[in-house]
Amino acid sequence: MSAQGDCEFLVQRARELVPQDLWAAKAWLITARSLYPADFNIQYEMYTIERNAERTATAGRLLYDMFVNFPDQPVVWREISIITSALRNDSQDKQTQFLRSLFETLPGRVQCEMLLKVTEQCFNTLERSEMLLLLLRRFPETVVQHGVGLGEALLEAETIEEQDSPVNCFRKLFVCDVLPLIINNHDVRLPANLLYKYLNKAAEFYINYVTRSTQSENQHQGAQDTSDLMSPSKRSSQKYIIEGLTEKSSHIVDPWERLFKILNVVGMRCEWQMDKGRRSCSDLLHRMKELCRYMNSFDSEAHNNYKNQVLYSTMLVFFKSAFQYVSSIQPSLFQGPNAPSQVPLILLEDVANVYGDVEIDRSKHIHKKRKLAEGREKTMSSDDEECSAKGRNRHIVVSKADLSNSIEVLESFKLARESWELLYSLEFLDKEFTRICLAWKTDTWLWLRIFLTDMIIYQGQYKKAIASLHHLAALQGSLSQPQITGQGTLEHQRALIQLATCHFALGEYRMTCEKVLDLMCYMVLPIQDGGKPQEEPSKVKPKCRKGLDLKLLPCTSKAIMPYCLHLMLACFKLRAFTDSRDDMALGHVIVLLQQEWPRGENLFLKAISKICQQGNFQYENFFSYVTNIDMLEEFAYLRTQEGGKIHLELLPNQGMLIKHHTVTRGITKGVKEDFRLAMERQVSRCGENLMAVLHRFCINEKILLLQTLT
């Protein structure tokens, strides 16, 4: 028998004995190895027995022997590959844990050599990178030799693979795993331009990761709650996983914290003016403002370093603060469907003074109802005009019930605005920030466009805000799936109301009304308590009420519809009380003044005064939409001798009725009777839901309302 045949016989005999007598099988193999020490099959069989018996130490020694003596055997590398895969695996099963323990028994030098050789045999870029990363973590001394090369390979692979998003497996491994190893190892020498390149890549990744829902998941409008027209959009319930990575690897804890740590390390390596200890975003921004003031006094190299310090520090404060603001006012953009439902908020001009700026000469027309009104404190007065505070220091009002952390959210909004202003205050910052935004394609970020729109409205640049809102609508259209007919997305409704508030601020009242009436089609009824007076705001009369000239309102029908009615009232009020006569506008004002009655009583008295001066009044929609008992009594009184016998044409087609009654019952008798009966019927309607009446008014009379403002 040949030597090869002898070896095969001994191995086969040992295999047969394993199930019956393990020790006998091992004795056969020990004898065989003594006789044929250069035979690989004998060594491998011994290793297999020890591995299957899960004897870590013995199996480790045998694996080491095979690695040293038979480095070219494919079976050895297959075995090593299985073990290194277990090292990268998150699984905690028994077999995986055994393989990890087996690897730990090997000498460190052998572990390092194994990992390097396995890496060389990997043809898949991602797998090769993970293996090399395993090496760098276990043997930090290898970072100097392999760290930068691995980082560049990952960035190159990202380019070659033409990844659509910065949030991909290659960038994740580079930013979260490789980059910290490189920049925290002071033996790795990195030029400043390479550090800035890496910081840029990290910032792009983390910001896109935090805000990924905006780009990666389509928004669509689901079934709406009857009490909430503009409820948060529903999204797919599947968890976010980066393609090529496991769910665990895809999850990043405290991404903002990680990003600012990278900023600090890069800053120290680039010799920025750093402060010891952690600084808040507010402190950091304040420091950057100070640095900008005396930056030009440094030499050219330091000057260049500090310019980059201001750029990247301010930029990160801006994106973080803007994100914190938007994620608070519209959390549905970033939260999964299982998160608690939160109503979005929308920034609007405050038109709470719509009932103000009224001076009434009560001596001209006194009635019992108006006498009662004399005792009531006016909600607004004309001197409030002096308190206007437009521009940089405008106030934003938000209810604690709508936003529990309102102080923090408004602070984030302030920091984001100030960061934005600083980034555009110097030519270098403007140029570099614009370049970065173009490279990152920030113009496609829906969440950022929402912030920018609110910022422009805050600044009072309403024409720019209108352009931004059209950009927002186009952007939303490109990201959304086709909508169900008759349903508007949250962003579409947000755009309508913000367009309305901007057109109003510009004095474009017909456009204001048009947007409001379009929005009315989306209102969900019934809205309860909409017609009750809001006593809370008028309990304490602020000295400068109009200084509070912006509001964050919930995107619900209950909150938005009253605001829309305020806008319409403000539009028609200006036309109704001019020197020229406009009964239609005056009639619309009277209908709209029913909301929040008696807050609008002073304005109603001014309307009555104007009717008295005219001696007559025509508004044929009166009995369709006026159900306020005080108003009905006032108009009934106007018909009496004491009220001035004012001629009122409030019934539909009343002119035709007068002609008809001339023949049959005389000119006035029949009309008076019709008016009395109509008034009695109207009194019986006083219990109707006022918001339903006003909603019907907006829907049914849309054409008439717009014609009045033409």
Swiss-Prot record:
It comes from the Eukaryota. The keyword Ubl conjugation applies. Its main location: nucleus. The modification Phosphoserine is found at S231, S381, S382. It is found in: Nucleus. GO terms for biological process: RNA polymerase II transcription initiation surveillance; snRNA processing. Keywords: Isopeptide bond, Nucleus, Phosphoprotein, Ubl conjugation. GO terms for cellular component: INTAC complex; integrator complex; nucleus. Component of the Integrator complex, composed of core subunits INTS1, INTS2, INTS3, INTS4, INTS5, INTS6, INTS7, INTS8, INTS9/RC74, INTS10, INTS11/CPSF3L, INTS12, INTS13, INTS14 and INTS15. The core complex associates with protein phosphatase 2A subunits PPP2CA and PPP2R1A, to form the Integrator-PP2A (INTAC) complex. INTS10 is part of the tail subcomplex, composed of INTS10, INTS13, INTS14 and INTS15. Component of the integrator complex, a multiprotein complex that terminates RNA polymerase II (Pol II) transcription in the promoter-proximal region of genes. Belongs to the Integrator subunit 10 family. This is Integrator complex subunit 10. It comes from Mus musculus (Mouse).
